Amino acid sequence: MASVEYLIKQFLTPDKKNLDLSNQNIGDKGAITLSKSKSIKRIKKLMLPNNNISDEGIIAIVNSENFKNLTDLDIYGNVISDDGVKAIAESTYISNLKKLSLYGNLVEDDGAIAIAESKILSKLKHLYITSNRIRREGIEALKNAKCRTRLCHLHVDDLEDFFYEEDQDYDDADLINSWEELKARNAEKGESED
């Protein structure tokens, strides 16, 4: 992997407002280096898909004053979980964010709820959060946020796509919990033990 500073020089647009580091595998170390770079203070659009960035890396980015002008953050296909998304939802440095792509990360309900309830992300209009681990509670929180606030373009997985139901009347009488219970059941059925 090339150094992050070299990649910035190669891929930062001449107006210094857009940086596309897609598929560069910069990881957390590279994300931390990026967050400290003096070259990106005017950046508005940051594209970091498929870079193996986890919570540590995204937390460094969203807590950097260098990203105070950021309006578009594309971090799909990384390994960002709820902690990273909560940092996004709580960071005052990225309060100008209008578009956020979290497609294909490790976000669960808590992360989705953090975005839905965020007071800081008041300008967010486009959210791409499909192909994560978000279930009913998170999806409903996001859909409710869309109805009452700013999310004009929300892309989440459909609830109908999930085929899970908690069966409250599940009869576990057939479950065997110990070796002794198995032997006793076999004896009741007249089956012999070898």
For each of these PLM feature ranges, what is it?
Residues 2-4, 24-32, 52-59, 79-86, ...:
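Short, solvent-exposed loop/turn at the beta-strand->alpha-helix junction
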Residues 14, 38-41, 65-68, 92-95, ...:
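Inter-repeat linker/turn residues at the boundaries of leucine-rich repeats
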Residues 1-46:
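N-terminal segments that cap or nucleate solenoid repeat domains
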